[in-house]
Amino acid sequence: TMYVRGLATMGAGTPLVLIDGFERPLSSLSQDEIESVTVLKDAASQALYGVRGANGVILVTTKRGILEGMKVHASYQFGINTPFRLPDMADGYTYALAMNEALRMDGLSVLYSNSDLEAFRTGSNPELFPNVNWKDEVLKNKGTTHQFNASFTGGGKNVSYFAAINYIGDNGFMNENYFSPDYSSQMSWDKLSARANLDINATKLTLVKLNLLGELSQHNRPATEYSTLFPMIYDVPAAAFPVKTSTGVWGGDNVRKNPVAESVAKGFSVGNDRALYADLRIIQDLSVLTSGLSAELAIAYDNRASYWDNKTKNYLYESLQPVKDNGGTITDITRTRYGQETDLSFSSSLGYQNRVTTFEAKVNYEKNWQDMHQLNAAVIYYQEE
C-alpha cells in the first residue's frame, strides 16, 4: 500500500495514479518506460482532480520518441530471492517432550512413553516416530528472478516513436523433491508486456499522441490456496506423521492434513491475466487566437481480464498406529487409509473483467510577465464509464 500523506491520509485511501493522464495501475509499467514522476498533494491535487485527488496524486509520464535515428537499449537482470524471518521449527523429540509436560501439568496421562521418546530422539523408527521439518519439506531456500528489457527510440521530421518490450519471470520457493512427473505445482509468475508511444506532428499546430500497451501474465501455484497451505506448515507437528509411509502412500491422519501432499498431490492452478491500455490525445495550439492558448481532446480504452484454469485431484493417505505387547515392545503397525487417488479434473473460472472508456477535453491558458509572474489556467471536462 502506498500513501502520499502518511498518517494524514483520509480513510487510509491510496493516491490517484495517472499514467500519461489516465488512471492506471503502476504495476503495468517497467522502470525503463518511465520518463518522470511528479507527486501532488493538498490543494494542488484537489484543484485539478477534485475528490479523486483527495489522498494525493502521482503523475507518471512515459518516455517519448526523439527526432533522430533509432537508438536501441537492452538489459538483462538476474536475481536470487531468499525468504527471511522464517521461524525455527521444533523437532519431533522436542514436541513429544512438550506434549507430555502439558498433559502432566493438567493431571493427565502422558502420550509418549520413555521408549517412544527415545525413538524420537535417536530417529530409530522414523515411520512411527517421525521428525519432519514441514517448512523444509514444502519450501526451499531460494527462488530466482529473470528480467529482460529492450527499448527502441527514434523518429523523423514529423513522426517520433518509443517502443519497449519487458519480460519478468519469477520461479518460487516450493521444494521440488516430491513434485509429480505429470505437472508442476511450483509457484511461478511470468509477465510479458509491449509498449508503443507514437507522436505525430499532423500540422505545425497539431500534435497527435498515440499510446498502446499490452500485457500477458501467467501465475502458476498449487491447487491448495496459499492461505490454507502456509498455516498448515506451522500447525502440523514434526511428530505427527511421516511425509510418506513405507508403502509409498502419503502420511496423514483424520485430524491434520499433510502439508507436502497438499502442495504437490492435489494438482495445480494457472491464473491468466490479459490487459490492453490504449489512448489517443490531440493537442491543438490556438496561439493564432491568443498567445498561450491551447486545447486538448483525449480518449482512452482499457480492457483487463483474469481467469483461472484449475486441474485438481485427490490423493490417498494413511495413518499409522503402533501395536505393542504388554512389555511395550512394538509388534505390528495398524494402517488406516483415507481418501483415494484420482485423475486430474479440469475446471475454469473468471476472476474479473473490466472495461473502462475515458474521455477528456481541456482548454489551457499560460501567460508570463517578464519572467516574474506566471498564470496557468485550465478548463477540464472528464468522463469515465
Describe each region flagged by the PLM:
Residues 31:
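Entry/capping segment at the start of metal-dependent catalytic domains
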Residues 21, 246-248, 327-328, 371:
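Detector for glycine-centered tight turns/loop "hinges" at secondary-structure junctions
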Residues 41:
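Residues that line or immediately flank small-molecule/substrate-binding pockets and catalytic motifs
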